[in-house]
Amino acid sequence: MVETELDTKKIDFLPDDMLEAAAECLKGMAHPVRLRMVNLLMQGEFAVHEIAELCRTSPNQTCEHLRLLKSHGFLSSERRGRTVYYKITSPQLPGLIQCIRKNCKC
């Protein structure tokens, strides 16, 4: 059998569990509206109606996107009276947004 360069080279793959976690994280973020919401929430806490207005989405769409982001552990919510406020709880999100800003020059 002939030995190739690839056989002798050590390939540095990320561990499978890390790749699975990254794919799940990116899947949760993989929508322009969700990215816009995260970008907004990096600037502070906002009520659902404020997020809807600033992100130019309907209240129903806003709630669905926020629900998904929260289910992935990116956000937390707090009800105060009749208003629900959201904020970022994931320490990884600011770095992800910075990476997008730096590398996605379209």
Where does each model-flagged region fall?
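N-terminal leader segment of winged-helix/HTH proteins
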Residues: 1-29, 99
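Short capping segments at the starts of secondary-structure elements
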Residues: 32, 43-47
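Pre-recognition alpha-helix immediately N-terminal to the DNA-recognition helix
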Residues: 35-39
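Conserved segment of winged-helix/HTH DNA-binding domains
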Residues: 22, 26, 85-106
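Beta-hairpin "wing" of winged helix-turn-helix
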Residues: 70-80, 87
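A short acidic, leucine-rich amphipathic alpha-helix
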Residues: 51-53
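Helix-turn-helix DNA-binding motif, specifically the short coil turn and the N-cap/start of the second
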Residues: 58-61, 89
